Amino acid sequence: GMFNIRFAMPTRTNGQHSNHLYPNDYFPFTYGESVDPFSGRSDGVLKRSMASGTEPKIMHIQTSNEYWVRGGSLPHTNPEGTEDAVLPNGVRFYTLGGSQHGSGSGLPRPASSGQLAPNPNRWSPLSESLMAAMVRWIAEGAEPPPSRYPRIADGSLVASHNGQEINHDAWNPLPGINHPTAIYQPGVADYGMRWASERIIDTHPQTARGYYNPLVPAVNLDNNDSAETTVLSPLTQVPLATFVPWNLRAVATGAPLSL
């Protein structure tokens, strides 16, 4: 959701299929500074706090699902998706591999609103461990585990598609399993004169002026995420199946080609 705009709806998000142009994902994405290719503006999430010496310690924890449905690579790349961003010293980034948005219970469940059964990977103990590390980092000055996330430089962060075709570095097609024809891309639009400085919407745009370029984690031949570039739970460290982070909408739900 989004909190920093007038009349924000904290639980509402835009996606590939719904809530297009709701201002949920917009520049700047990175904690350090990057340049917006559309406006030429240089900015970063922590720019003001770094200038005042009040920057917080941050653990950014997300799953591999966020790369497909939320533009999850943009906090650690430039907006064009051509190079890795530099994380400030007080920021750690952890990508939880082979996982859906919310932690599973470890037990399988039948499919419902999606074409695939919900991903059962139970990753909540990983976030709980990182929370304990955060407390030690703040209270005792103990360094937390190093960041672990896929990167452009080593080939572990890749394009989801090559043109209209799925990129086999991102997904190896399986018989009987439909795969996404596109992923969610945050758009840039005109919300009026007060948007940039006050986060007040004076104009509700009907179209985007352009789109940023999110990437996704590369997978192995079994379509599972790597232990070297994502944090894996025991269930996904020695997988007995493919732990898919995305799920296309069920036919009964509608828009079955959408995430």
Please provide the spans of the model-predicted regions:
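C-terminal His-loop and adjacent cap/lid subdomain of alpha/beta-hydrolase
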Residues: 1-259
